[in-house]
Regions:
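Structural/interface elements that position substrates and couple domains in central-metabolism enzymes
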Residues: 39-492
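General helical structural elements
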Residues: 6, 14, 33-36, 485
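Coiled-coil-like amphipathic alpha-helices with heptad-repeat character
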Residues: 5, 24-28, 42
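Leucine-biased recognition of intrinsically disordered, low-complexity hydrophobic segments
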Residues: 5, 11-13, 19
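Short, low-complexity, charge-dense intrinsically disordered segments
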Residues: 10, 23-37
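Generic alpha-helical structural signal
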Residues: 16-19, 26-30, 99, 423
Length: 492
């Protein structure tokens, strides 16, 4: 059954022809108490006119948009965020800091409990930040989807991983759309932030919302796409000062999304539609993906040619135009670069019936790098008259990027797997990772990054690491990041 607040909203919709924007908003707000509580309320006949809503009834779009824009401007709007992970939690905090009341939804009860107890589930977000938001009374977390009915804007920040055959897995997005359709009410703004292929917002999310709710995009509610641009650990660019791209299903949807994000971000960029916004995100990540693959392949043949690629990049980067520096490494990791370009490749193959060769080649090269690292490790051990089987190998930094705890798609894991398969006695050190497993096997944690080993491999140059001390103490050091020089240091 639709929650009471949604019923209130539908009755207000029926009354809309005789109500002004302010009165319409007020009728909706009569169905609210404080944030976090949905109430059943009796509907007074004195304010509900004797009209019934027919299937072809349409409330003027200006009324809906005008009321919503005012709520955003005055910060009276309640914001709902679905998914409180690396994207949803920072977005929730940014909206709360902008003056909005935020209801965060997640299916993980432990995460919700942590947030409501002022504990941060993410290492790069301090507990104090969560505590302050909760203390101010404008941030709460829940596992109850009915509480999203009170939200004026609902932002979807759920994972979009790859399936077993590296095909797009939209199950989290689809589950969220089904859930929101049950609480969707007129006047709401729904925004998908999860990275996906062009057309998902219009072809997947829209029909699921419309069919189950009986409401229509652009008439009853707004639907848009706005790609997340979170860079965990980046202290220079955060949610506030990173430009926000928005694209709606209709122009009014774009305006509604732009109005909300304009209160949260310094700069809003309007795309022509949701499809252009979806493509913009994939373009950003595909650009990085193929350029990282370029320098990774160059690193392999530069080693064979005896050329210091890092020095070549340093020199090339002095050109003030037409060049952007990318650097080789042990592979690509994180929630974007290894995943997102595959969504675009899938879309091209599925609809146009031909491959996106740049992406597929880049994927092949970047996926090859962990194996190349292990081959270089074996080569270095051989020069020291040691076999990989039985050699003590220490991995430094197992997260996907420096100075954060995020291990998603980290190349450290496939590297470790290959080292174990060759018989290496493996240990690791990472200031952000207290315990680490590979295929269910616990890997011993070294007491210090300078612990003695037959071979030390630097995978992430965390700022906490004293790289000079590591170089001075290592018997053999394979530097996959080009950060260290020394007699016992060998580049990728």
């Amino acid at each position: 059954m639709r929650p009471a607040l949604a019923v209130v909203a539908r009755l207000a919709l029926a009354a809309a022809p005789s109500l002004g924007a302010a009165d319409y908003t007020e009728q909706i707000r009569k169905g609210r108490k404080e944030i976090g509580e949905i109430v059943s309320m009796s509907i007074e006949n004195s304010w509900v006119p004797a009209v019934t809503q027919s299937d072809d009834f349409q409330r003027p779009a200006k009324l809906e948009l005008g009321a919503l824009l005012k709520q955003f401007e005055t910060r009276e709007a309640v914001v709902g965020v679905v998914g409180l992970g690396y994207v949803g939690l920072p977005l929730s905090l940014c909206a709360q800091q902008a003056g909005f009341s935020v209801v965060g939804f997640d299916i993980n009860p432990g995460l919700v409990e942590d947030l409501n107890a002022s504990r941060s589930p993410l290492g790069h977000i301090p507990h104090e930040k969560i505590a302050q938001a909760c203390k101010e009374g404008r941030l709460s977390a829940t596992t109850d989807p009915d509480r999203l009915a009170m939200a004026d804007a609902i932002l979807i920040c759920v994972p979009t991983p790859l399936g077993l055959h590296r095909e797009p897995d939209l199950s989290f997005v689809e589950d969220t759309a089904r859930m929101l359709a049950k609480v969707l009410r007129p006047g709401q703004l729904i925004v998908l932030e999860s990275t996906t292929y062009p057309g998902t917002t219009d072809e997947v999310v829209r029909p699921m919302l419309e069919k189950a709710s009986g409401l229509t995009v652009g008439i009853d509610f707004h639907l848009a796409f706005s790609p997340e641009r979170i860079d965990p650990g980046n202290e220079r660019y955060g949610m506030r000062n990173t430009p926000k791209v928005v694209g709606g299903i209709t122009p009014a949807c774009t305006e509604a999304a732009a109005a909300f994000y304009g209160q949260v971000c310094d700069t809003v960029v309007k795309a022509k539609s949701a499809r252009e916004a979806e493509m913009a995100k994939l373009l950003e990540n595909t650009y990085r993906h193929v350029n990282i693959a370029l320098v990774n392949e160059m690193a392999i043949f530069c080693h064979e040619l005896g050329i210091d690629l890092w020095d070549s990049i340093r020199c090339a980067a002095t050109k003030p135009f037409g060049f952007q520096a990318f650097y080789p490494g042990p592979g690509v990791g994180g929630h974007c670069i290894p995943i997102d370009p595959n969504y675009l490749s899938y879309k091209v193959r599925a609809e146009l019936k031909h491959p996106f060769r740049f992406v597929e080649l880049a994927q092949e090269i970047n996926s090859r790098m962990p194996g190349y690292v292990v081959d270089r490790a074996a080569e270095l051990l051989n020069t020291d008259a040691k076999a990989m089987n039985g050699a003590k190998v220490l991995l430094l930094g197992v997260t996907y990027k420096n100075d954060i705890a995020d291990q998603r798609e980290s190349p450290a894991r496939p590297i470790a797997r290959k080292l174990l398969q060759r018989g290496a006695l493996l240990s690791y050190h990472d200031p952000y990772v207290d315990g680490w497993q590979v295929d269910g096997k616990d890997i011993r944690r070294a007491q210090a990054p300078t612990e003695q080993a037959d071979l030390t491999i630097l995978l992430q140059a965390h700022s906490e690491y004293d790289l000079d001390a590591i170089a001075a103490n290592a018997h053999l050091l394979l530097d996959t990041r080009g950060k260290i020089s020394g007699d016992s240091v060998y580049p990728l």
